[in-house]
Amino acid sequence: MLSTGSNSPEAAVLPGKPEVGLPLWLLAELTYRCPLQCPYCSNPLDFAEQGKELSTEQWIKVFREAREMGAAQLGFSGGEPLVRQDLAELIGEARKLGFYTNLITSGIGLTEQKISDFKKAGLDHIQISFQASDEQVNNLLAGSKKAFAQKLEMARAVKAHGYPMVLNFVTHRHNIDKIDRIIELCIALEADFVELATCQFYGWAQLNRVGLLPTKEQLVRAERITNEYRARLEAQGHLCKLIFVTPDYYEERPKACMNGWGSIFLTVTPDGTALPCHGARQMPVQFPNVRDHSMQHIWYDSFGFNRFRGYDWMPEPCRSCDEKEKDFGGCRCQAFMLTGDASNADPVCSKSPHHGMILQAREESETATHTIEQLAFRNERNSRLIAKG
């Protein structure tokens, strides 16, 4: 039986509340609508069945309450946030409140005029994502024949408007062997920051894990090449910064996910559900909604946000582990996805009794034969089919 510990009588009583910090980082998932179909999207599988999006006024109320509580950084995400017609207005209101604002976008739907409007509204930062350095592979993964050309044009336009060029490439077994070409493209575009983020397995990426997880050999090679480029760029005095993010499937200790559950990070989904991380929606927990509760109540008093705070909730082997203050027991969403119980130790940890699942995934990556065309693409049709079971 799947469990987060939230549906049993024993779980109704929480341990004493640990000290709670401020929700410094607010992620506003403005919409699940998106013109692309990336098979590694972190959105929930049943996104097509989610409720009505928050209105402009409701989002502004969220921003105001979060800012009053100490939130400092606000990310606009999705889906594709550009499909919201009120995006410039939301950026402007966030600016008035004093947020540092970041637009996380595919670049599809972006125009020179919108960049100008966002600049006037006070947007601080734009990150554009690519699927690959090769036009054919990029467009195949995105599910759009025009995606690559649009991304190139908008990356240059963002820089021309005075923004630093920040690019994100999600890497996986189908594009990681071209890491050198990806970096060369970024250099040619005069990128300032490049995130080479190996696929993290949540949402659609978890559904497609066997077809996306790189082999260890692929990862080692990609990281070596990235380090070689770093050294070369530094020697040349080049300002481009390369950030290489590995999947924890090849680690022996889990990541300190979100710096701890309900520690500094707060996500609000398109329908107003508030989450301690953007992957938590899959858990069978009744998370609070901003339509019904204040941000103050959600952050400090709601069951969902307090469930895995601190250390008292931990079973063994986490409870007695001398590393628990470093990794907080790892990722609760990953523990739930793989074991059915979010209170279990993250299976990535070699101390977890479920670590064999990770070892099996590594073995499967060595023999996987999935093509890009065989992946389940993130679109409304597939989402509705999944929701129906």
UniProtKB/Swiss-Prot annotation:
Cofactor(s) listed in the protein's UniProt record: [4Fe-4S] cluster
Family matches, as SUPFAM superfamilies: Radical SAM enzymes (SSF102114)
Pfam family, any one: SPASM
Top-level enzyme category: oxidoreductase
Cofactor note (record): Binds 1 [4Fe-4S] cluster. The cluster is coordinated with 3 cysteines and an exchangeable S-adenosyl-L-methionine.
Domain annotation Radical SAM core: ranges: 20-235
PROSITE patterns per the UniProt record, alphabetical: MOAA_NIFB_PQQE (PS01305), RADICAL_SAM (PS51918)
GO annotation, biological process: pyrroloquinoline quinone biosynthetic process
Annotated positions binding [4Fe-4S] cluster: 34, 38, 41
Pathway(s) this gene product operates in, as recorded in its UniProt entry: Cofactor biosynthesis; pyrroloquinoline quinone biosynthesis
InterPro entries: 4Fe4S-binding_SPASM_dom (IPR023885), Aldolase_TIM (IPR013785), Elp3/MiaA/NifB-like_rSAM (IPR006638), MoaA_NifB_PqqE_Fe-S-bd_CS (IPR000385), PQQ_synth_PqqE_bac (IPR011843), PqqE-like (IPR017200), Radical_SAM_PqqE_MftC-like (IPR050377), rSAM (IPR007197)
One Gene Ontology MF term: S-adenosyl-L-methionine binding
Alphabetized PANTHER family for the sequence: PQQA PEPTIDE CYCLASE (PTHR11228:SF7), RADICAL SAM DOMAIN PROTEIN (PTHR11228)
Functional note: Catalyzes the cross-linking of a glutamate residue and a tyrosine residue in the PqqA protein as part of the biosynthesis of pyrroloquinoline quinone (PQQ).
Subunit-structure text: Interacts with PqqD. The interaction is necessary for activity of PqqE.
Name of the protein in its database record: PqqA peptide cyclase
Organism lineage: Bacteria, Pseudomonadati, Pseudomonadota, Gammaproteobacteria, Pseudomonadales
